[in-house]
Amino acid sequence: MGGHFISLVIIWMHRFTLKQFMDYFHKLVEEIELHSVEGIRECFSNGVSPNDFFRNQPLIYELTSEYTRSPRFKDCVRAFVDFELDFKDKILLSVLLDDAQSLDAHLKDNPEAVRKEYTLRCAYTPLYKVNLLHICAEFNHVRSAEVLVKHGADVNTKAGVDEYGFGGQTPIFHTVNQNSNRSVDMLNYFLSKSTDLKITVTGLIWGKGYDWETLIPAVNPISYAMMGLLPQMHRDEITISKIVSTLLKAAYGIDYTSQNVPCRYLKE
C-alpha cells in the first residue's frame, strides 16, 4: 500500500482537510531540513505518513539528502521509525539510527553486509557506491562504525567511481570538511585506526546535483580538507586549519600550525 494512499485514509479517519494535510506535509520538509525532531513528530501526528514520497523518493531520503548535520539526525530517523516507517534494509536502518546493538545482531546473521554497496543522494561528499562505513562517516555515527570494523569492515575501503572516473574516496574523506565539523568524532576514530591519509583520488564532485556542485580534482584527505576554504562550502577557516594540522601530523609527523589564520590580507 503506497504512502500517499495511507495518508488519504488518515485524512479521512481524522477528518483533516486536504489543505491541512498539505500544510503539514510542507512543514515536514522544513522540519527535516532543520533536524527538528519534535516538528517531525508533530507532522506525523497530524496525518503525514513517514512512507509518503517527496520528489519521487521516500521521505526518509529527503532526510539523508539534506545539508544539515547534527547529533539529532539519528533522532529524526527514530521519529520515522516510531510512526511505522516501512524500510526493508534493516542493516542500513540500524546505521542511520546508530543502533549498535541492532547492527551487531544483523551482521552476525549477514556478515557480508559490511561490503554491500549503497548509493544515496548527498549534499556534500558523494555517497555513490559506498559501503556502510562511508555512511557512518557522513553522519558521524561512531558506535555503528565500531561495530562494522569489529565485523571486518576496512577503514580504507573505497567508494565506487562514476562515469568520469571521479570517486573512489575512503570514508575519512567524508569527515575532513564536514558542515560545522560535525563528523569530527568519526575523523578521530579513523585516525585512531591509522587510516591511510595519502590516498589520492582522481576527483570528487562535491554537492552533485545541488546549486553548490563543484568538481574538486586530484585530492587526498589532507588537500580535500583544505577545500573547506572554498566560499561555497561555508566552513570555518580556523577549524579547517586545525584539521589540516592534525592530518599533517598524523600522516607525516609534521607539527605545524598556520600562523596566518584568519588570513590578514583578506581582512584588509
What kind of region is each of these model predictions?
Residues 41-49, 75-86, 107-119, 146-155, ...:
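Ankyrin repeat domain, specifically the short helix-to-loop turn at the C-terminus of the second helix
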Residues 140-142, 179-185, 236-242:
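Surface-exposed loop/turn motifs in large extracellular/passenger domains
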Residues 234-268:
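Terminal, low-structured helical/coil segments at or just beyond the last alpha-helical repeat
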Residues 35, 72, 98, 140, ...:
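Ankyrin-repeat intra-repeat helix-capping/turn positions
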